[in-house]
Design a protein with these regions (language model features):
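Short, well-structured N-terminal submotif of metal-dependent ribonuclease cores
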Residues: 1-38, 52-66, 70, 117, ...
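Phosphate/NTP-binding elements of NTP-utilizing enzymes
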Residues: 46
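Active-site neighborhoods of divalent-metal-dependent phosphate/nucleic-acid chemistry enzymes
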Residues: 56-58, 62, 69-118, 124, ...
Length: 133
């Protein structure tokens, strides 16, 4: 399974060239197997970006989310184990959304697709793919 960071989700949805060829292939292969997921916090993050006028979606956020889920994207809800794990990520910056997304990937033994330099450089057992590659 792969977990998309919020920006990777947006890049995938928009067919943004910022999403690298290797990551695109990884996502496409995982999509066919029904193994592409996001943390529920990514929908919160996206809604906040829309509300602040930093991005525009083709649909209202609720409908956009529904379409992605109907197309096969898996949403992993934030449960207690993920919340606790998010507090235990040593040497990770304090951004709670990043912590929840990382904890979601770790809890599900998934590869996180991200372009976040801090996450990519973080020394840990987290499996990760640079979304730009």
């Amino acid at each position: 399974m792969i977990v998309l960071d919020t920006h990777a989700l947006l890049w995938m949805d928009r067919d943004d060239p910022a999403l690298g060829a290797a990551s695109r292939r990884l996502i496409e292969d995982a999509w066919r197997a029904g193994q592409v997921a996001v943390s529920a916090i990514s929908f919160w993050e996206t809604a906040m970006l829309v509300q602040r006028g930093r991005i525009v979606l083709p649909l209202p956020t609720t409908e956009w989310r529904s379409e992605l889920l109907q197309a096969g994207l898996r949403e992993i809800v934030m449960e207690g184990r993920i919340g606790i794990l998010a507090t235990q990520l040593e040497n990770m910056h304090r951004d709670p959304a990043d912590r929840f997304i990382i904890a979601t990937a770790l809890q599900n033994q998934a590869t996180l697709v991200t372009a976040d330099e801090n996450v990519l450089a973080w020394p840990s057992e987290l499996l990760r793919q640079d979304a730009r590659l």
